UniProtKB/Swiss-Prot annotation:
It holds the Pfam family Metallothio_PEC. The lineage of its organism: Eukaryota, Viridiplantae, Streptophyta, Embryophyta, Tracheophyta. Induction: By abscisic acid (ABA). GO terms for molecular function: zinc ion binding. Belongs to the metallothionein superfamily. Type 15 family. The keyword Zinc applies. Keywords: Metal-binding, Metal-thiolate cluster, Zinc. It comes from Triticum aestivum (Wheat). Binds 5 molecules of zinc. May have a role in Zn(2+) homeostasis during embryogenesis. This is EC protein III. InterPro entries: Metallthion_15 (IPR000316). The keyword rRNA-binding does not apply.
């Protein structure tokens, strides 16, 4: 899977393998856990301006991540609150 806005990587992708999603097992109980090579969890929005782990009233939520209050990047602006 190539780099995209669901991996927490820079958009547009700078290239290389740093923005490719991979599956890794953290432990047997947790099962498959998908992470991105740049350190973010796939499914979270890629805002560099901050995230909130719980719903904040902003409509743009992915995999339990939502845009921080100060976010105005394209991913956060893709939906309206």
């Amino acid at each position: 899977m190539g780099c995209n806005d669901k991996c927490g990587c820079a958009v547009p992708c700078p290239g290389g393998t740093g923005c490719r999603c991979t599956s890794a097992r953290s432990d047997a109980a947790a099962g498959e856990h998908t992470t991105c090579g740049c350190g973010e969890h796939c499914g979270c929005n890629p805002c560099a301006c901050g995230r909130e782990g719980t719903p904040s009233g902003r409509a743009n939520r992915r995999a339990n991540c939502s845009c921080g209050a100060a976010c105005n990047c394209a991913s956060c602006g893709s939906t309206t609150a």
